[in-house]
Each structure stands twice: as C-alpha cells, then as structure tokens.
Amino acid sequence: MNQLEEIVKYVIYKCRENNHPVTETLAAFVTQTIYNPKTDRFYLEDKLTASQVDELKATVLQKLSQIDKPNMKTIQMQISYDSAYIESEIQRQERIKNQSIETGKLTDEVVSLEIKNAKDFEGLTVLFKKIFNFLLYKNKELMYDGTNKTGNQDSENQATQFNIEKEVAAGLESVIPRAALGPFVSLNPSEKVTQLVELSNLVIGIRLFNKWIQKGGIGLVPFQDLLEYEGRDLIERIRQEAFEVIENCDNYTIFFQNVGPGKIKISDEQFKQYKDELTFLRQYLSYILSIQEDVDISENSVDSNQTRYLKEIKDLETLLKQKSSAPKEQVYPKFATLAQAYIQLLEEKKLCLTRVKLFELLQEMRKGFKLTLPRNLILTAKNISQDPSNEEQVEIEYSEDCGIERLLPKNTPDFMQTPLDYLGFCLWSIVKRDGLLLPGKPALGVFRYKDKNCVFSDEKSINEFLSDPQQFIQGVINQCRKNPELIHLLRMDDSFKNVNLNIYVSGQEGGHQLSNKLMVDKGIETPLHFVEKRLDPNYCWNEWELRKKALQMANIRKRQTKACQTILSNFKVDSEAQTYLPKDNETNTGKTEWDIRKFAIEQAKKKGIIAGTDRAPYPIHPRNYITGLRDKDTN
C-alpha cells in the first residue's frame, strides 16, 4: 500500500467517525493537492517521512471539515459534474457498442451464408429469415427513446411484438421478395453490407410513413414526442441561468478592480472569501456555457432534421396519394431520408435528456452556495469605476526583440478565433493577486510566449509581464498549487498529471476512462471436479469404458438362455470361486508302528477282547526252515 492509499483510507474512516462522510474521490483529490509551504510543492510530490504523513493527515481532515467553504464547494462541483458526465458518456458508448456488436453478428450471419446458386430454394429461405431477423432488430432499436428503460408501454405486449414482425415482414416483401434474392446472393461481402443498411432504412421509412398516415408503425416513437418532451426548453433555462451568473461575475469583477489603496479596503479574510466565491461562479459559468454550446448544436440539428422529415413526408403523400404503388426510383430515396432524419432526432432526444440531468445537477450545487458580497460594496465599486479621475493612462512598452509576439486585431487575420490560454483571464491578476480571476482584454493585444496566448486587464499588467514573462508562467503553476480548484478551471491538467481530475475521476470507484477502458489481468483457480457428499460407487468417467459397457448391455439384450450351458454360451466370462482347502484325513506323529500296535493290544486287553497272547490280534507264528533234504550236499 502506497502513502496515498494509506492516507485516503485513514481520512475516510475518520470522516465517517466524525459523522460527515466523504467520497473516496474527494478524499483522494484533496490529499493529493495539499500545499506544503516549506517546499512550495504538493506534499505527495515528494517522499514523505512518518511525521510528514501524520502532518498531512491532520491537514486533510481539517480541510475536509470545512466542506462549506467556497473553495471546497468548487472542488465538490468539479468532481460531481465530471463524474456524472463521464458516467453518462460511458453508458452511451456501452449502448452504442452493444448495438454495434449485435448488428455485426446479424450482418455476419447474412453475409457468411453460403448458397449453392440463385435457384436454391432452401438456401434462399434461410437467407430471407436471416435478413428478416436483422431488420427486426434494427426496428426494435427505435422503441427506446431515453425516457424509459424498456421502451414503450406496449413493448412487452405479445400482440404488439407480433404486429411489429408482421410490418417488418411486409416491408421486406415489398422491397425485395424472397424470389428476388438471386441478385443479392451474387454480391460481394461489402456490397451485401451496404445493401442491408439501405434495406433497413427503407423498411424503417415505410413504417414511419405508415405511422404518419395511421396505418401502422406500431412501437415507433411518435414524431411529436421527438420534438415535445420534458427538457425541450433547456436552451431557454440555460440562457436565463447564464445571464444571472454573468451579472454576478461582473459585479465581483467591478468590486475587485476597485479594491486597493485609496479605494475599497477589506481584510485578507474577506478578500479570500470573495475571491473563492468568484472562482465558484467562474467554474459554474464555464459548465453552463459548455452545456449551452452543446445544446445550440443539438437544436440546429433538430431543426434541420425536422424540416427534412416533414418535407419527405409531404413529398411521399403527394406521390402515394390515391395510388397503390409508385416508381421505386422516386419513393425509395425519400423513405431512406425519412429514416435517417428520424434516427438522428431520436438520438438528439437521448442526448438532450442527458444534458438536462447535468444541468439540474449544477443547479442543485448552485442552490447550496451562498454569495456573501454585500450590495453596498458593489454599488460603491460601481461609483468609483465611473469616476474618470481614477483612470491612469499608461503606455505599453513593447519591443519586437523581446521574444514575445503581440497579436492585434488589425494585423492578425481571424483574430477573434485565436485560442486563449488560462481561459482568457488576466495572467497578472492570477499571479499577483493570489489566483484572482479577472477577465483579460484581447483588444490590448494577445501576447504569445512559449506557445501560450496570454491576455491582461490593463497596460500596467502588460508591462510587468513583458519585463519577466517566465516569472508569470511559473507563477500560474505556483498559484494552482496554492488554489487546487484552479487546476481544472484553467486547464492546467498537463502541468499536474498526477492530479488530473478527468483521469482520476474516471479511474476511481469502478469507473473507466472515456478513450480506453481500464484493462486488468485477473485469474481464478477452481478444482476440476468438486468432491460431492454423495459418492456413486458405480460412477465411471472414462468414455471408452462407458462405451464398452453400453455395447455389452446391448449385446445381452439380443441373447437367449439355452438348456445346455457351456463355457461358450456363458459369454466367455471367467467365473472363479474361492473356498477353504479340504481337511487332512491322516495325522503324522512321532510314534513308530510298533508303539501303535502295542497301544492297540493294551486297549484290547482292558476291554476283555483278548484273554491271552494266543488270541492276540497279531499272534507270532514261528516257522522252522529245514535244509539239506532231497539228497543235496550241504557241505
């Protein structure tokens, strides 16, 4: 965790503890823009020690506790407005992106479809369905006008959906019937895409004309709803608000021009209070004028498209009046123009509703801000400015060899289109009067130094700038460090890239940048097979084993049991059984045969079976062998 994250988390926790929570964006911006008077830099521009970190934490908490101060109100307005603007732009880009992706998929299905030839009926039928799906999606896009999330109130009605499909199918059949798709098949991919776009405009134009004559166009936003809706008077509201803010700015400008020795005297605290109030008004006016510029462009677009739409409707009524058909060379371009004007009007309505939300956000911020400059001081300043004796005549001491280019209306073509740096405020008053924003006078000349076009409020300021221009260029940066609300107002983001409000707001709290999304690598690991509580002992994951079992089961179903069963009829399955070995019938001991016989005789005598030895079971029969008989010599 770096020092910024550590301090921001601590500040957010402490603010919640003190019962005045702040957003992470505000806490981070204030933390990064705390001025260190010892180094004339921001604290976080240098590596901080532990004591400096504690000092910075205390300073941030003290500044956030003064949330009602004019300078903090200005920072709050900058963050709130830029966050809302970026969020609306992200939503609009996401919507356009999703529509483009879906349209691309449907277009690819049509373009990539391969058909044998122009007489392939089945292939042409499939192609016709895919073209119909493309047109149906393009027509359903027009059901959303920005006032709701689901389209018109009857968009979910099945009957309405059916009627939309019916109208789209009829429009497709009238422009290019199914049997006439042969020439479309022979086109190359780019030509097919062009034809699809033109076909979409034609079908939409036909449905728009049918809606105008009240014979169809179900689901389409009525033409009057594109011209009359809440927020259509935004341009008048903005002009009225801008007029009031400009009047207040002029009063503050006259007051500060007459503050000084011999004129109006105020304390330093009052000077800072009124100066910060003027800064808030300048920033508020900048946002108001930015919205007004966008609304003016939008109004011009609405007027031109409204004129085109009504003109094409009138021409189509003339061509198709009391006629069932007309030459396609005359009506097709008008249907296409009608669709294009309608789509642009629909898009302008969505943008206008977004600008209304931004304008209401600014008005809410303005209502919570109170101006404290007394009316009597304003009147005193106006009286002093009307006294001609207070005007000093000073000549501008300019020479061409000073390295500064002077642009005047008489010697510069397109002088009024010259871009002014620092938003056209007097450079001298910013540097010498603690960031005071007084308007410069381009009529005195635009002074270009190091690609910076600077203007000043009087001749005396110009002469001081000409004597040391680098001091003023660097002085603006120093004043932005002391007054961080000027960084965004004076377009000084390039000089403070680490505290660029646009990039910082878009990258915080799950946001994204407008140009490119913030991409990160992220991975997660999960087990291939989760261990289940219930285990199946017969579970088998091997597909080959399952296939083998399936074949065996299918083979068994076709078998029949015979009366005589052999090994061959038993499906060649080896059957084995395990039993105990048979017991031994004989016992081997250490006794001899004579001992056994003697034991048997003794047992027989005990039982009275044998009375004497002559009746023993094994009596001894003596035998005598005589030799030498039959005249044989034994010697």
From Swiss-Prot:
Biological function: May regulate cilium motility through its role in the assembly of the axonemal RS2 radial spoke.
Keyword Cytoplasm annotated: yes
Disruption phenotype: The mobility of cells lacking CFAP206 is decreased. If their number is normal, cilia are slightly longer and display uncoordinated motility with abnormal waveform characterized by decreased bend amplitude and decreased metachronal coordination. Cilia axonemes display a classical 9+2 organization of microtubules but their shape is abnormal.
Gene: CFAP206
Record protein name field: Cilia- and flagella-associated protein 206
Localization of this protein: Cytoplasm, Cytoskeleton, Cilium axoneme
Keywords: Cell projection, Cilium, Cilium biogenesis/degradation, Cytoplasm, Cytoskeleton
Pfam families: FAP206
Any one of the GO BP annotations: cilium movement
Keyword flag Iron-sulfur: no
Signal peptide boundaries: none
Record-stated family: Belongs to the CFAP206 family.
InterPro entries attached to this UniProt entry: FAP206
Cellular component GO terms, alphabetical: ciliary basal body; motile cilium; radial spoke
